[in-house]
Amino acid sequence: MLLLALALGAARAQQTEFLPELDAHLELNDRSRIFLQAKDDREGGDPTQFTFGPSLLLYRKPLLRLKHVLVFDLDSTKSRPVVIETGYRIITAPDAAITNRLIDAVTFHYPLVSGFLMTDRNRADLDWQNRDLTWRYRNKLTVERTVGIHGYHFAPYAAAEPFYESQYGKWASTDLYAGVSLPFLKRVDFEAYYEHENDTGRKPNRQKNYVGVRMQIYFSRLQRAQGKQTAR
């Protein structure tokens, strides 16, 4: 919480934009889930735009050490050592043609000492707008730890994500994050974060700051099926 407060204070001297996001997750079984994402998106130097679309996540059985670290986390995929994602996004922006994006990602979760978790997401975006085709690679490293106060558990985190952009032929942007995940009831998680972006793709270099709020809702067909079996 202190890290997030300091980051927000540092951003006051510069213009700060607000980024809302809503994600709905549906666990299909113990090895897959789908989710639908709707968000204002400025990642990797992108202009003002709205992103919407689904993803499919595939994974194997949870790792016992990860389950112990994440016992209070609503996102069960964090307990899986490897998660594969494939998805599609439609992207709209003012005065611009629609962009279509294909997403492929592999995410690794590593339990660290003292209850810390490190997440390493490797993602490739393939974009096409009219007849123009571009791609980018992004690698997001996140470190988080669940903290409990008077029976309530939340997870502060810090993250860094560099972007390699094909249109510039170089590492063109780096996003830094500080945030906190706040579970609410049994199915909802609110995430508040500060994001600082260093965009070096075009000259002059640009520094941008954002404050984001992400609401994630979790549903599970697996739990529903188990509940019906118990009722019988």
What is the predicted function of each stretch?
Residues Q14-F18, D30-I34, L70, S76-I84, ...:
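Outer-envelope beta-barrel architecture signal
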Residues T16-F18, D46-F52, I98-L102, L133-Y137, ...:
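Residues that define the transmembrane beta-barrel architecture of outer-membrane proteins
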Residues D23, G53-L57, V69-D73, A105-T107, ...:
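Outer-membrane beta-barrel architecture
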Residues R60-L63, Y110-R202, V211-Q223, T230-R232:
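Outer-membrane beta-barrel transmembrane domain signature
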Residues T92-V113, L117-M118:
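Ordered, amphipathic secondary-structure segments that act as subunit-interaction surfaces
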